[in-house]
Amino acid sequence: MKKILYVTGSRAEYGIVRRLLTMLRETPEIQLDLAVTGMHCDNAYGNTIHIIEQDNFNIIKVVDININTTSHTHILHSMSVCLNSFGDFFSNNTYDAVMVLGDRYEIFSVAIAASMHNIPLIHIHGGEKTLANYDEFIRHSITKMSKLHLTSTEEYKKRVIQLGEKPGSVFNIGSLGAENALSLHLPNKQELELKYGSLLKRYFVVVFHPETLSTQSVNDQIDELLSAISFFKNTHDFIFIGSNADTGSDIIQRKVKYFCKEYKFRYLISIRSEDYLAMIKYSCGLIGNSSSGLIEVPSLKVATINIGDRQKGRVRGASVIDVPVEKNAIVRGINISQDEKFISVVQSSSNPYFKENALINAVRIIKDFIKSKNKDYKDFYDIPECTTSYD
């Protein structure tokens, strides 16, 4: 039996990969363990480890990295705790592969620890660009430590190969999240209202994270957004979902809570992925800078008002409206999203991240990988036409 460890650090990433984990758990020749860290272990972000426990996965390791303060220095301390904890863990626990998704700093620490113990890494969602965040260089660094790559578009597959990864180790399966939006059983509006209260006919969902490399302060970023939303306070309802634990997220959390209290809008620290998708499905659109607005929401035929540069560089479909972090621009974006012509565009648009059978293909590729001899040295793949000659 082959052993795989999946390490999860956030509610969003776990929601994307949960169906994959379920299918791997049900595969007879695989023993699947989970290690839980990051936001899952913090009350300020919903203590979402309970969701994983309810799903009955075998949690073999829990690492609380203390992320209730989000300065650059504190995040570096959290990364150090994570690196040391998983370094010790891998000294006493061997796996045929460690699987991770995305680009968060705690996952970076896990990837380093696994690599130093010569455990093959499987990386999901590599090759993507997010230019206004340190996620950008973290993601590409994880790619260089990984031996199997499951990308979400053909463009990202090419970029992973451009980083020197062998083409035979890189597979474009599409996004599991884009497939989830169409395949998961989503609650209906009445079921949502039993959990979260009455949903008005005209409401937006808002998810806003810090731009960690921006020259604009987090204070200014969130102030511009809230000023724009207040413009619609008499015509629309707004449901805010808590932000990721990035540098400055505690500032966003504090200001959003105060804003919601003042205008009687709802603030939810965290919700299950099915509820999140359903809440957006019945809404007027998603406002903010979450990657879900580009990857999952287009499958629901709902508009995304994507704010700022957090997602700059990512592939996007016609349902996405890009605006800078500036009040008047955000107001214009919200108004465009409600225009009948644009709604028609959204309804007829396709999701560039969707590819049929993403889940089935992911399981097949992972099974083939762990059965193969993957302990060989990683070689750097030189793209022939990019090799410089000095002759």
From Swiss-Prot:
Domain of life assignment: Bacteria
CDD domains xref list: GTB_UDP-GlcNAc_2-Epimerase
Transmembrane segments: none
GO molecular function, one term: hydrolase activity, hydrolyzing O-glycosyl compounds
GO BP term, example: carbohydrate metabolic process
Gene3D superfamilies xref list: Glycogen Phosphorylase B (3.40.50.2000)
A Pfam family reported for this protein in Swiss-Prot or TrEMBL: Epimerase_2
Role noted for this protein: May be involved in the synthesis of polysialic acid (PSA).
Further remarks about this protein from its record: On the 2D-gel the determined pI of this protein is 7.38.
Protein name: Polysialic acid biosynthesis protein P7
The species this protein was found in: Escherichia coli
Biological classification of the source: Bacteria, Pseudomonadati, Pseudomonadota, Gammaproteobacteria, Enterobacterales
Gene, per the UniProt record: neuC
